[in-house]
């Protein structure tokens, strides 16, 4: 993390529980990010907070630090807690898993138990873990409601509630589910409630604040919606040149870790086929990919076993993957806010990043709304058709995926 990105607030100077302070220090957390520096003095004092900050600014560690501190300072050693004391809700299962992973070092240090509850996979396995006892339940609304209605867990002992990517949960229509779960928890005055998101509309704040106790709203205003450390670039390819331009730019840029976004599952599969045939270590992440495969792909990408991830917007929000160097918008998104969410995968936590977008014949009409929303024109670059790489015969999904150890190379084509 870049030092100039951090604030002057040290974690060691905050009134943290000694176990939390020690775990953070051991993990290398010294200075707070701006959102942490603003939110923690509020939440550590037991007051509700709604935090808005640009993607990748440390929101997750802000609410995890406050959650573990609150539970450790509000527990009776003479009591056993058969049900969860904290509930962390996320819009997607991938984000829930990432929050759980981020919480591991705090759980290990504190002895507090975390458990996951998300749909699509592992129902019985998740149930077994929860039945063994859980202090902090992290999950998606649907699966948590299932367990509540079955009597597997109760929410009457909840001391902390977190809504992560809150606006996304409202956008996805989870408002009724959220309110159902919050009504099962103690009253807002009897718990600590935190909302964090990259964007929090007035409507979302109004709805959410009905279930919060006089929250304090804080915001880290970015220099621009897209992040000043992201270098943006725009091409106007013909539909015929589009795929060849992508492969050529991959060779020219040689990204260390890259996400390519497209608007449809079919287009993602097509892109994957050409990139795989061109010798790239590439994974495909769409809504149709089985849950175990999705988690495996994300781990491979995070661990560096895959260099490129081709994804629909199912992966555009909440994926906390560090060191993404490049984002390609193969298709300009129909929703202008998705442009910000997509390219927010790079340039995180003070690092620099590159965003390259294609305004093709099919989606160029989306560009004016995007540029109006981000408040600036995206710099345009030119290309020469005769300099584009020749397209290989693409792989199809029914064919075997190249071995993960397949080596990327620059000599596959002659430029």
Curated annotation (Swiss-Prot):
Its EC number is 3.6.4.13. Coiled coil: none annotated. Its main location: cytoplasm. It is found in: Cytoplasm. GO terms for molecular function: ATP binding; ATP hydrolysis activity; RNA binding; RNA helicase activity. PROSITE patterns: DEAD_ATP_HELICASE, HELICASE_ATP_BIND_1, HELICASE_CTER, Q_MOTIF. It catalyses: ATP + H2O = ADP + phosphate + H(+). CDD domains: DEADc, SF2_C_DEAD. Disulfide bonds: none annotated. It is an enzyme of class 3 (hydrolase). It comes from Haemophilus influenzae (strain PittGG). Component of the RNA degradosome, which is a multiprotein complex involved in RNA processing and mRNA degradation. Signal peptide: none annotated. The gene is rhlB. Belongs to the DEAD box helicase family. RhlB subfamily. GO terms for cellular component: cytosol. This is ATP-dependent RNA helicase RhlB. Gene3D superfamilies: P-loop containing nucleotide triphosphate hydrolases (3.40.50.300).
């Amino acid at each position: 993390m870049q030092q100039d990105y951090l604030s002057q607030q040290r974690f060691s100077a905050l009134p943290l529980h000694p176990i939390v302070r020690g775990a953070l220090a051991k993990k290398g957390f010294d200075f707070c990010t701006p959102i942490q520096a603003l939110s923690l003095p509020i939440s550590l004092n037991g007051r509700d907070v709604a935090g808005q900050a640009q993607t990748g600014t440390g929101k997750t560690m802000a609410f995890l630090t406050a959650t573990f501190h609150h539970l450790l300072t509000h527990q009776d050693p003479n009591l056993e807690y058969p049900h969860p004391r904290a509930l962390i809700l996320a819009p997607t299962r991938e984000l829930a898993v990432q929050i759980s992973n981020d919480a591991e070092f705090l759980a290990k240090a504190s002895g507090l138990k975390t458990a996951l509850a998300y749909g699509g996979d592992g129902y019985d396995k998740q149930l077994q873990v929860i039945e063994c006892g859980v202090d902090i339940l992290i999950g998606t609304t649907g699966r948590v409601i299932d367990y509540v209605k079955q009597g597997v867990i109760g929410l009457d002992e909840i001391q902390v509630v977190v809504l992560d990517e809150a606006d996304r949960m409202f956008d996805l229509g989870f408002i009724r589910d959220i309110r159902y779960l919050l009504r099962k928890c103690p009253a807002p005055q009897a718990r600590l409630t935190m909302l964090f998101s990259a964007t929090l509309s007035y409507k979302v704040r109004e709805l959410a604040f009905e279930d919060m106790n006089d929250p304090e709203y804080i915001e880290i205003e970015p220099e621009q919606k897209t992040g000043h450390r992201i270098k943006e670039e725009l091409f106007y390819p013909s539909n015929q040149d589009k795929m060849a331009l992508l492969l050529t730019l991959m060779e020219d840029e040689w990204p260390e870790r890259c996400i390519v976004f497209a608007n449809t599952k079919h287009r993602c599969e097509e892109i994957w086929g050409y990139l795989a045939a061109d010798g790239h270590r590439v994974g495909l992440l769409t809504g149709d990919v089985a849950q175990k495969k999705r988690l495996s792909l994300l781990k491979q990408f995070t661990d560096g076993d895959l260099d490129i991830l081709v994804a629909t917007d199912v992966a555009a929000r909440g994926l906390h993957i560090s060191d993404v160097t490049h984002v390609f918008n193969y298709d300009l998104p129909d929703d202008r806010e998705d442009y910000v969410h997509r390219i927010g995968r790079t340039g995180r936590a003070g690092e620099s990043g590159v965003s390259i977008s294609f305004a093709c014949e099919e989606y160029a009409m989306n560009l004016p709304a995007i540029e109006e929303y981000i408040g600036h024109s995206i710099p345009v670059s030119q290309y020469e058709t005769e300099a584009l790489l020749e397209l290989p015969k693409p792989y199809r999904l029914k064919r075997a995926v190249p071995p993960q150890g397949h080596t990327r190379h620059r000599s596959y084509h002659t430029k």
